[in-house]
Amino acid sequence: DLKNIIYNLKDLSKHSQISLFVDNMKGNKVNYDAIDYAIYVGANLIEIHTGYFSKHIEEGNLSVINEIESLINKANKSNLMVNAGHDLNLINLPHLVKIGGINEVSIGHAIVIDALNYGFEATIKSYINTIKG
């Protein structure tokens, strides 16, 4: 089972960090079960799948900010580091950064698209400035 696999991986290297990729929503409710499960199996951190968050931010549904914030807060209070990624871009990333409590974000194809439109250097600077707040 996953708990034993994680235990064995950590036993191989005391510096191993085990992350689980989790959905922030389960149906129409915040997925707190993902945090409980991550703790149960011995993960050190979670990476929140931000596709749902990103879609709703771009549609103007800002209530999703409170939902993901409560998940991040619970994870942080449970001593889990939090990473986030999926469909993040310069439109929705500021909302996520403002919440705080996130160790790292993964930004994929949005950087490539923005770099094609605005140039690589300008795009990287924009993302760095956004992340720094």
Regions found by a protein language model. Name each.
Residues 18-22, 46-48, 82-86, 103-107:
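Hydrophobic faces of well-ordered beta-strands that scaffold small-molecule active sites
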Residues 45-56, 101-120:
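Glycine-rich phosphate-binding active-site loops on the catalytic face of alpha/beta enzymes
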Residues 9-12, 38, 75, 96, ...:
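Generic structural signal for hydrophobic
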Residues 14-74:
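Histidine/lysine/aspartate-rich catalytic loop segments that bind and position anionic ligands
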Residues 60-61, 114-133:
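C-terminal helical cap(s) of enzyme catalytic domains, especially alpha/beta-barrels
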